[in-house]
């Protein structure tokens, strides 16, 4: 019998967790190890970076390792600790092709109850993560973090007591602060202060509904960023992300419309507004083979100043060779026109073939 798209999406989303190895299970305590190794071979060209010709690369694409420990207290109460690492070095640095330094991507603890919800503390995803429906493996054309941060140093609450419905709220705290020494390795009199341009604090609320072939999600966030060293004023970002979709289960097809709006309030400079709309689809071509794509139109404007319009399209095909082995081909093209006295047009295009091995 043909799998429903809902089952495929859930399976893909939880692939690494489903393949994790249980290394300890005793007296209500469960410890799992898992992750994936991901490689992509690509060709890319960008007038934004003044490239004269296409560049090819074979590099890391989101390889990760995680450890999760869960302890069940009884009566539905539990505690969980989670740590996930990533490779973070850029391909242009140290010739690493993104296989350089290893850092902690997520690290948090959770206290919860199946009926009352859970509280999460640490570096984690927020309720804004996963709001949009567009599928991508590498070249996603949606910049959700420009509207609402999707992760950070947070205290969050999530409620999943109603089938298909998730409610959540997050408070974001500062994460990136000045070190004891500056870039010249001299004592830094700003040590401990939030870095300019980084998150100072923020709040988010959101709701996600995914049941009965209907997908509806929305999140709102207000985030304050450090403005400068001269005063205590902040740069405030107010943003909304939303998606609305419908699954034609018999056809294995999901159609969706993602959208977002944000306004950045600057203390002494002009305010900035941005919005985007993005129709997309995901289609089960055959068992274990899926086709997906989306188009985006985004507009950014500064009060009585620069205006930017971007049109982008993404298309991809993935095939599961084994429950722990996924291959895909994906391409994206973006065209950006900036108007500020004159007109400047920039183009970016990328295509890649990737392989993921889960463990």
From Swiss-Prot:
GO terms for cellular component: cell outer membrane; pore complex. Residues 1-20 form the signal peptide. One of its GO terms (molecular function) is porin activity. It comes from the Bacteria. GO terms for biological process: monoatomic ion transport. Keywords: Cell outer membrane, Ion transport, Membrane, Porin, Signal, Transmembrane, Transmembrane beta strand, Transport. This is Outer membrane protein P2. It comes from Haemophilus influenzae (strain ATCC 51907 / DSM 11121 / KW20 / Rd). The lineage of its organism: Bacteria, Pseudomonadati, Pseudomonadota, Gammaproteobacteria, Pasteurellales.
């Amino acid at each position: 019998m043909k799998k429903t798209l809902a089952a495929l999406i859930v399976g893909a989303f939880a692939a690494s967790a489903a393949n994790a190895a249980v290394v300890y299970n005793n007296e209500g305590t469960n410890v799992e190890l898992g992750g994936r190794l991901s490689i992509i071979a690509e060709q890319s060209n960008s007038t934004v970076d003044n490239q004269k010709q296409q560049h090819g690369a074979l590099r890391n694409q989101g390889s990760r390792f995680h450890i999760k420990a869960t302890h069940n207290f009884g009566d539905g109460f539990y505690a969980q600790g989670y740590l996930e690492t990533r490779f973070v070095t850029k391909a242009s640095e140290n010739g690493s092709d993104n296989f350089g330094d290893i850092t902690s991507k997520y690290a948090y603890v959770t206290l919860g109850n199946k009926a009352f919800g859970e509280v999460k503390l640490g570096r984690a995803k927020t309720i804004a993560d996963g709001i949009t429906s567009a599928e991508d493996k590498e070249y996603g054309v949606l910049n959700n973090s420009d509207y609402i941060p999707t992760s950070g140093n947070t205290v969050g609450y999530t409620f999943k007591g109603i089938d298909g419905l998730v409610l959540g709220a997050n408070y974001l705290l500062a994460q990136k602060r000045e070190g004891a020494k500056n870039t010249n390795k001299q004592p830094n009199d700003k040590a401990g202060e939030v870095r300019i341009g980084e998150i100072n604090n923020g709040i988010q609320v959101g709701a996600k509904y995914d049941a009965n072939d209907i997908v509806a999600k929305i999140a709102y966030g207000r985030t304050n960023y450090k403005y400068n060293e001269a005063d205590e004023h902040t740069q405030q970002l107010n943003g909304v992300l939303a998606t609305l979709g419908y699954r034609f289960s018999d056809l294995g097809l999901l159609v969706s419309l993602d959208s977002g709006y944000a306004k950045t309030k600057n203390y002494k400079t002009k305010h900035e507004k941005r919005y985007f709309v993005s129709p997309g689809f995901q289609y089960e071509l055959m068992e274990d083979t899926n086709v997906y794509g989306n188009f985006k139109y985004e507009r950014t404007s500064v009060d009585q100043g620069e205006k930017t319009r971007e049109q982008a399209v993404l298309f991809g095909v993935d095939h599961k060779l084994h429950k722990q082995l996924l291959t895909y081909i994906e391409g994206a093209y973006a065209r950006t026109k900036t108007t500020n006295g004159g007109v400047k047009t920039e183009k970016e295009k990328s295509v890649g073939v990737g392989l993921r091995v889960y463990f």
